[in-house]
């Protein structure tokens, strides 16, 4: 297995099959084109998911020893996400 520091140093530095870029670009698009009706590239709208954030989430999950991570676009959206994970009346400590 690759050492963690090597993995993190190389995170996002893979050749993009679509563009040929070596370093991860910052994707600023808000919407994404799809090959056809009913087929998706996996990215629909930047606020829900984008290629740049997907690489960040993958790195965070690996760093923490998890399988998934979520990066939100703002602190308020992170708070909203946490509140949606619990039923009304639940008690949790932050």
What kind of region is each of these model predictions?
Residues 85-94:
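Conserved PLP-anchoring active-site segment centered on the Schiff-base-forming lysine
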């Amino acid at each position: 297995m690759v050492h963690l520091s090597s993995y993190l140093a190389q995170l996002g530095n893979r050749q993009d099959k679509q563009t040929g870029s070596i370093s991860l670009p910052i994707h600023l698009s808000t919407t994404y084109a799809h090959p056809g009706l009913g087929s998706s590239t996996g990215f629909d709208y930047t606020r829900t998911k984008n290629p740049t954030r997907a690489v960040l989430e993958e790195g965070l999950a690996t760093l923490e020893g998890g399988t998934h991570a979520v990066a939100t676009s703002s602190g308020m959206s992170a708070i909203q996400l946490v509140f949606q994970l619990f039923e009304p009346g639940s008690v949790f400590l932050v």
